């Protein structure tokens, strides 16, 4: 449901600027959210393993993040002797930038102002789904720049594994997104989220949701798909040679990518910010509940992704390739046929 807010006409021209400010605030909030995701993963992992986890520095160990950040950013910034200086120094910045570029098209809610819908995002694009997919795929170039610039065999092997995995899983991921877009008749992620109402796409396309979630896990490189940085084989994979602040940039880029992936699951399959009518029509809850409900879904998806780390063992690289081409690709095509048929039926 949508929220209606009546405001003076003279404020209407300022709305793009207001939305831009909101978008910048969201960028900062996502960075803090990445720090929170690190703490959440450590605490949730500790609970699963019957440990305490961070508990000494601050209440519930919350200040452990600050302590780790101070330690990380004050470490010596070392560069291998034979590394490519240009690539080695700038690749983490490129990778972080490509992740943040995804954020500008991802909304966290929407309001109706004088009959016009304005999403809470930096910008709204008619092809925002394709834009997000493209920015997500660009991160592989940052990883290759890091690996090649490091002049390290373990880094390069990790990058090759990452490339092999992304090539296989971007295909079913993209087909599933197209299936969702067909149901809505739009590539605008705002329209896809709004069109679901309370009948979420997870109920209309359950197979598509499963394929999308598995492919997204592989795209993010989370267990059981972290063959590109498996400690037993490749030390730390593509980021082996990095220390200090540059290591921190690559590390946080992974967690920000994980948060944005959780956003996409909530937007494409879990109804986004849609709430029941009695909540949307409440003058107080109507302003808070949609975004709060959306963020709650995002946190639940994030906790599921984190929990998978301790629930499923790491796959071999051949198992990863087989799962993509022999399982997920046929299922994604089957879901595409289902989406087309269901779209024609509902349209009729």
UniProtKB/Swiss-Prot annotation:
BP-aspect Gene Ontology terms: aerobic respiration; methanogenesis; methanol metabolic process
Enzyme class, broadest EC rank: oxidoreductase
Enzyme Commission (EC) number: 1.5.98.3
Keywords annotated in UniProt: Cell membrane, Electron transport, Membrane, Methanogenesis, Methanol utilization, Oxidoreductase, Transmembrane, Transmembrane helix, Transport
Transmembrane segments: 20-40, 93-113, 127-147, 172-192, 198-218, 259-279, 286-306, 328-348
GO cellular component assignments: plasma membrane
Domain of life: Archaea
Its membrane topology: Multi-pass membrane protein
Record PROSITE patterns: COMPLEX1_ND1_1
Alphabetical list of InterPro entries matching this protein: F420H2_dehydrogenase_H (IPR053455), NADH_UbQ_OxRdtase_su1/FPO (IPR001694), NADH_UbQ_OxRdtase_su1_CS (IPR018086)
Known catalytic reactions: methanophenazine + reduced coenzyme F420-(gamma-L-Glu)(n) = dihydromethanophenazine + oxidized coenzyme F420-(gamma-L-Glu)(n) + H(+)
Recorded GO MF terms: Methanosarcina-phenazine hydrogenase activity; reduced coenzyme F420 dehydrogenase activity
Compartmental location: Cell membrane
Keyword Transport: yes
Subunit structure: The FPO complex is composed of at least 13 different subunits. FpoA, FpoH, FpoJ, FpoK, FpoL, FpoM and FpoN proteins constitute the membrane sector of the complex.
Function recorded in the entry: Component of the F(420)H(2) dehydrogenase (FPO complex) which is part of the energy-conserving F(420)H(2):heterodisulfide oxidoreductase system. The membrane-bound electron transfer system of the complex plays an important role in the metabolism of methylotrophic methanogens when the organisms grow on methanol or methylamines. Catalyzes the oxidation of methanophenazine to dihydromethanophenazine. It shuttles electrons from F(420)H(2), via FAD and iron-sulfur (Fe-S) centers, to methanophenazine (an electron carrier in the membrane).
Family listed: Belongs to the complex I subunit 1 family.
NCBIfam families: F420_dehyd_FpoH (NF040610), PRK06076.1-2 (NF004741)
Protein name: F(420)H(2) dehydrogenase subunit H
Organism for this UniProt entry: Methanosarcina acetivorans (strain ATCC 35395 / DSM 2834 / JCM 12185 / C2A)
């Amino acid at each position: 449901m949508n929220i209606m807010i009546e405001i003076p006409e003279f404020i209407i021209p300022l709305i793009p600027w207001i939305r831009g400010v909101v978008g910048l605030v969201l960028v900062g909030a996502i960075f803090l959210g990445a720090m929170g995701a690190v703490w959440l993963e450590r605490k949730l992992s500790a609970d699963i393993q019957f440990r305490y986890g961070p508990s000494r520095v601050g209440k519930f160990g919350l200040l452990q993040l600050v302590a780790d950040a101070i330690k990380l950013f004050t470490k010596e910034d070392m560069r291998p002797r034979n590394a490519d200086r240009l690539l080695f120094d700038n690749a983490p910045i490129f990778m972080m930038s490509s992740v943040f570029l995804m954020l500008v098209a991802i909304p966290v809610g929407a309001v109706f102002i004088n009959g016009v819908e304005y999403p809470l995002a930096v910008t709204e694009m008619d092809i925002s789904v394709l834009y997000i997919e493209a920015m997500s795929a660009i991160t592989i170039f940052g990883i290759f720049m890091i690996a090649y610039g490091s002049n390290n065999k373990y880094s390069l092997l990790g990058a090759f594994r990452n490339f092999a995995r992304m090539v296989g899983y971007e295909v079913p991921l993209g087909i599933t997104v197209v299936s969702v877009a067909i149901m809505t008749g739009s590539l605008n992620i705002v329209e896809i989220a709004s069109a679901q109402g309370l009948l979420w796409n997870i109920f209309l396309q359950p197979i598509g949701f499963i394929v999308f979630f598995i492919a997204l896990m592989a795209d993010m490189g989370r267990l059981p798909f972290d063959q590109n940085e498996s400690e037993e084989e490749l030390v730390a994979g593509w980021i082996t040679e990095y220390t200090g602040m540059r290591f921190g940039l690559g590390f946080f880029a992974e967690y920000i990518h994980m948060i944005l992936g959780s956003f996409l699951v909530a937007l494409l399959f879990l109804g986004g910010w849609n709430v029941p009518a009695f909540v949307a029509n409440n003058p107080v809850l109507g302003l808070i509940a949609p975004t709060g409900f959306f963020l709650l879904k995002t946190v639940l998806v994030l906790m599921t992704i984190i929990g998978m780390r301790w629930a499923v063992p790491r796959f071999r690289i051949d198992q990863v390739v087989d799962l993509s081409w022999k399982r997920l690709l046929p299922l994604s095509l089957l879901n595409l046929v289902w989406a087309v048929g269901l779209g024609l039926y509902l349209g009729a």
